[in-house]
């Protein structure tokens, strides 16, 4: 336990002191839930984003970029205005506010996931739970919307929100994106950007932020075509699963190939399974150890309002336990259907049949001679409405007429005789459908922190350094003259400039002893130091020192860029 605390504190110190991450607005006392990326942290963050971006571009996906500020109508349609909430309570004495479920969970040691505000209030009263700040009485629990509210323009009649997810920017653009994809399913679209959640009480440092970065991928597909064409390439990939059944029975994780997971019913289909493999491979490519990754199926009460099945991809932290870093959610057609309903836009895809089909269709219209005098000017409008109804809507009218002999339509009571009902046969060449969506959603900040936590090494000789995956290092090469004297400095600087032009992230450093400089660059994860010593002017060679082994090899200067490229990028 002591080693764990020391490691955590050493990492916090390293991140602040060496320019990875620090609290935002420090000179004004800071603000909880906000962090700034320093020069080294920003490089690693961009490298994580690059790994994700390149992986999905290789799959043939499209990237877009949409605004952070979004009109209220979008989030009314998506359900976020009503459902993106957390339970909140307030101390009646000191006015402090807290996540009610967190307080109850900490005091009673129970799982509060999915408990209603009323149930949480009941537990607070039954167990006389008090304010953790002053011991005062807590108010009844209510729901607090986590979106940051704002206004678009100078007037308050146009409400907006900072987006809580990047996904909606993709969904509202579906019509244009579908045209870009030439009306062919499946296709994928991703967006990397900021999202915002006004967390009630952000805790655990970088793991719970009010402003954070996401990479969300929306894969649109025909729900009748749930098999991925390239599943054979990944079916033998072994993943660690923690399905619902094992959680409820305390059975622990199981290791299965993706093929086994699909056949045993843990994963719904090969389409879902393929992207599980892809997510795992991206995390490995970032540098997360395989034994620190697991796939945990969310319990029904944990799922977001739009999800019918979600697997969280979690990374293990020595200090915080298993941390959700990626969510893979089956969103069905929830989002697109909601936007169709609220906006009236046509967000369907035309699926063409291989051969035309003959289908039976119900057609209902008004018997204008009979209803004309009764409906008067509304008859034409109601008849047009009937022509625009879906088959499902027409079937409901037909069933109502068959059961009780009448229906109510736009305020009028109409009998079966008021309609002309026909069943006709039509030759159709395809059908329109609202696509379903599978969403892998990556956090960026959590994998960033957990990459560093899993990379920090504390040697027995008190050496602290980042054993980060070599191509993820913020500084890839340090060029060091053995001493700050000519001709070593001139040669070293020329090598530094050459490596810059070759595309390496490289620094030149001639200050302090070479031992101190090695330690300085080991600490921030620089995988290789190139040293120009007294032998260099004689034979045009330099040493390359390995961060992890501290061993050195000599290479000719002209071979240096290619050798470093091989060592760092493989």
From Swiss-Prot:
Belongs to the class-II aminoacyl-tRNA synthetase family. One of its GO terms (biological process) is glycyl-tRNA aminoacylation. One of its GO terms (cellular component) is cytoplasm. GO terms for molecular function: ATP binding; glycine-tRNA ligase activity; protein dimerization activity. It holds the Pfam family tRNA-synt_2b. Catalyzes the attachment of glycine to tRNA(Gly). Its EC number is 6.1.1.14. This is Glycine--tRNA ligase. Substrate binds at residues 99, 165, 212-216, 439-443. Keywords: Aminoacyl-tRNA synthetase, ATP-binding, Cytoplasm, Ligase, Nucleotide-binding, Protein biosynthesis. PANTHER family: GLYCINE--TRNA LIGASE, GLYCYL-TRNA SYNTHETASE/DNA POLYMERASE SUBUNIT GAMMA-2. Disulfide bonds: none annotated. ATP binds at residues 197-199, 207-212, 324-325, 443-446. It catalyses: tRNA(Gly) + glycine + ATP = glycyl-tRNA(Gly) + AMP + diphosphate. It is found in: Cytoplasm. It is an enzyme of class 6 (ligase). The keyword Membrane does not apply. It comes from Thermococcus sibiricus (strain DSM 12597 / MM 739). Coiled coil: none annotated. CDD domains: GlyRS-like_core, GlyRS_anticodon.
């Amino acid at each position: 336990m002591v080693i764990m605390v020391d490691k955590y504190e050493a990492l916090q110190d390293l991140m602040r002191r060496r320019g990875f991450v620090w609290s935002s607005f420090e000179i004004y006392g800071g603000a909880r839930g906000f962090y700034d990326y320093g020069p080294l942290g920003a490089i690693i963050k961009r490298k994580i984003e690059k790994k994700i971006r390149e992986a999905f571009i290789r799959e043939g996906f499209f990237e877009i970029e949409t605004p952070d500020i979004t009109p209220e109508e979008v989030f009314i349609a998506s359900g976020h205005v009503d459902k993106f909430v957390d339970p909140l309570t307030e101390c009646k004495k000191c006015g402090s506010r807290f996540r009610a479920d967190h307080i109850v969970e900490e005091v009673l040691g129970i799982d509060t996931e999915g408990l209603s505000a009323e149930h949480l209030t009941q537990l607070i009263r039954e167990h006389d739970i008090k304010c953790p700040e002053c011991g005062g009485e807590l108010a009844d629990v209510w729901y607090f919307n986590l979106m940051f509210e704002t206004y678009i323009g100078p007037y308050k009649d146009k409400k907006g929100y900072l987006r809580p997810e990047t996904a909606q920017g993709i969904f509202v653009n579906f019509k244009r994106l579908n045209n870009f994809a030439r009306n062919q399913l499946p296709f994928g679209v991703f967006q990397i950007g900021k999202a915002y959640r006004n967390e009630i009480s952000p805790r655990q440092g970088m793991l719970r932020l009010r402003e954070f970065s996401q990479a969300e991928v929306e894969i649109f597909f025909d729900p009748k075509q749930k098999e991925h064409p390239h599943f054979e390439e990944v079916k033998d990939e072994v993943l660690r699963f923690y399905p619902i059944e094992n959680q409820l029975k305390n059975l622990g994780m199981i290791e299965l190939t993706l093929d086994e997971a699909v056949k045993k019913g843990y994963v719904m289909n090969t389409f879902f399974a393929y992207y599980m493999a892809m997510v795992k491979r991206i995390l490995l490519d970032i540098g997360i150890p395989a034994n620190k990754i697991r796939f945990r199926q969310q319990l029904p009460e944990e799922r977001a309002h739009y999800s019918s099945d979600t697997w969280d991809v979690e990374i293990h932290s020595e200090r915080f336990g298993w941390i959700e870093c990626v969510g893979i959610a089956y969103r069905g057609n929830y989002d697109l259907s909601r936007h169709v309903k609220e906006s009236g836009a046509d967000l369907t895809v035309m699926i063409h049949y291989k051969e035309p089909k003959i289908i039976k269709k119900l057609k209902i219209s008004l018997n204008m001679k009979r209803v004309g005098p009764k409906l008067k000017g509304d008859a034409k409008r109601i008849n047009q409405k009937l022509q625009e109804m879906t088959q499902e809507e027409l079937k409901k009218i037909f069933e109502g007429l068959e059961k009780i002999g009448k229906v109510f339509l736009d305020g009028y009571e109409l009998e079966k005789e008021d309609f002309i009902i026909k069943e006709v046969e039509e030759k159709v060449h395809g059908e329109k459908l609202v696509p379903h969506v599978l969403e892998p959603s990556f956090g960026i900040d959590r994998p960033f922190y957990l990459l560093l936590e899993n990379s920090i090494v504390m040697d027995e000789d008190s050496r602290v350094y980042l054993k980060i995956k070599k191509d993820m290092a913020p500084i890839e090469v340090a060029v060091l003259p053995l001493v700050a004297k000519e001709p070593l400095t001139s040669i070293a600087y020329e090598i530094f400039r050459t490596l810059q032009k070759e595309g390496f992230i490289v620094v030149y450093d001639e200050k302090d002893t070479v031992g101190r400089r090695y330690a300085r660059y080991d600490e921030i994860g620089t995988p290789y130091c190139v040293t120009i010593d007294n032998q260099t002017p004689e034979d045009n060679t330099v040493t390359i020192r390995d961060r992890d082994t501290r061993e050195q090899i000599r290479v000719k200067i002209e071979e240096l860029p290619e050798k470093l490229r091989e060592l760092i990028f493989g």
